[in-house]
């Protein structure tokens, strides 16, 4: 019953979108000299994109926003749709405790959310790093084993955060009995967190 094919399409579409942004990040320093002097902020930020680790961090943050909303949608499909309204009365007829069904569905949603973001990031960074070994856009940095390790850690960390945001949003949406609120809360929360992480990242680099 769960639209796995639709989820895979979302993952591939998101991966294509994030890959495009990743290449854009890598291209920004090359156009720094062409940016009008009046755009001081852009000039200040451009050097940030001169290393792979920062690009990976920014892409992972954006991926977290996308998959926080994805996670909320998965929780909507697995939890809110089944435990609110008429479908809940159907669950009462099952010989299994509702709490057990709820727990299994919640764990499944968490695993699916984390796996989806990890798969997406794997596609994005594998393709990006591979092309960088052939036609490097980032000057002054190199692909290394430690880079893959750091990228993997970032992807895992942010995928867990995205799933946690989806879980929190689901709890709020469950109380309000609204799938729309679940999605809105997940988007708002993830955007707020991403802005805080971006500011923190820039502060560390400075």
Language-model regions, residue ranges each:
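Transmembrane helix segments
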Residues: 20-28, 173-206
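Residue-level recognition of transmembrane alpha-helices
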Residues: 11-12, 105-106, 186-187
